[in-house]
Amino acid sequence: MCIRDSPWVEDASNEYIKRFGIDYALVLKMIKPAKRKEGRKIASLLIEEEQKIKAALPHRTRLVVMDETGRAMNSMAFAKLLQYWGQQSLDPCFIIGSADGVSENLKKQSTLLQLSEFSLPHGLAKVILIEQLYRAVSIIKGLPYHRS
């Protein structure tokens, strides 16, 4: 089974990724979700997905789960948070969970941030997150992209 984004998600994501330039590296990894089979409990699926996520993580990572219960913040606050993590030499790893979210254990080990109070399809959540990362970088670098 191949996991691919819709063409519009790839196009929009790539548009923002190319704007980052050489100062910031953005690495995207898509983890194949656990197979949803009749009789499997969601908790066991989420634990399997947690193991796959952790296996794909680099060292010295700050886990950030995008979650509906996470802290809401504006773009300026998000930029300050990214800047702080950079000063601490922590590479943030942003996680958008499967359709069932992420395991409670992974949530406990992570900073929880909210993209929106709306439920979003994964592709749109990905594009919004990448755009907000670019916006935060432009704020940090003093570029004119963000207007308060």
Predicted regions and their residues:
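S-adenosyl-L-methionine/SAH cofactor-binding core of RNA-modifying enzymes
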Residues: A25-L26, K32-C93
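Structured adenosyl-cofactor binding patch, chiefly the S-adenosyl-L-methionine
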Residues: E104-R147
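A short, Lys/Arg-enriched amphipathic alpha-helix followed by its capping loop at the start of a domain
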Residues: A12-D23
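Conserved small/polar residues in nucleotide/adenosyl-binding loops
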Residues: M1-D5
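Rossmann-fold NAD(P)-binding glycine/threonine-rich loop
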Residues: G97
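Short conserved AdoMet
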Residues: G21, L57-P58, K107
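Short N-terminal binding/cap micro-motifs at the start of the first secondary-structure element
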Residues: S6-D11
